[in-house]
Amino acid sequence: MSDEFSLADALPEQSSAKPPAVTNTKAGHSSQGWPGSSPWSNPSAPPAMPSGLPPSSAAPSTVPFGPVPTGMYPSMPPTGPPPGPPGPFPPPGPSCPPPGVPYPAPAVPGPGPTGPYATPNMPMPELPRPYGAPTDPAAAGSLGPWGPMSSGPWAPGIAGQHPNMPYRSPGPYPTVPPPVSGAPPVPWGTVPPGAWGPAAPYPGPAGSYPTPAPHPALNNPYQVPSGPAGAPPMPGGPHSYH
């Protein structure tokens, strides 16, 4: 056993002064236990592009409605009218005349009147006459606002919407007859003056009424038995047994 002291034997295994063990690895091959470059191990490395998205340098898409839309839903095409200044309203032109201007006369005038109407081939129907009116129009009475009328106050020749209910004639009415001479008229609700005569005695009854009597007992099986007067015993109360 050698008594030589070696400094490498006194240093721990993780010390940097201890020479590392020589491994039999070929040049150009990395260790299997360490991953490749990543943003955590190599901050200067460019970030990796997520799979599924096109690179930023890709050519713009040629779609019929313009460039690729941007926003919350880029896959939905834009809706509505194309961008641009709105057109004038109402549209210019003679489509509608300005307000307050009368319409022009038609270029082609319509047909004028053709003359008197032709005589109808059927006679006009006769108007209904009121009840009791004469058949000959010449014999009818004076024509009033409600049809032919006679001179009497309630003549039968009066016409109207209901011929059987005559209307008063607009002519002069007969004079109201004077009141009959005698007792003066008394206003309603007053007692006329004068004696009313003695008070007559009130007539008595024509005969005497029969004395009331108890009705005869009928053949009723549910007769109430005769007993002492008073209220019947209450149900559930004390009973007297005989």
Swiss-Prot record:
Spans annotated as Disordered: 1-145, 192-242
Biased composition (Low complexity): 30-43, 192-210
Entries under InterPro entries matching the protein: MISS
Feature: compositional bias, Polar residues: 13-29
Keywords of this entry: Acetylation, Phosphoprotein
Coiled coil segments of this chain: none
Residues recorded with modification N-acetylserine: 2
Biased composition (Pro residues): 44-53, 75-114
Modified residues annotated as Phosphoserine in this record: 2, 6, 15
Family: Belongs to the MISS family.
Protein name: MAPK-interacting and spindle-stabilizing protein-like
Gene for this chain: Mapk1ip1l
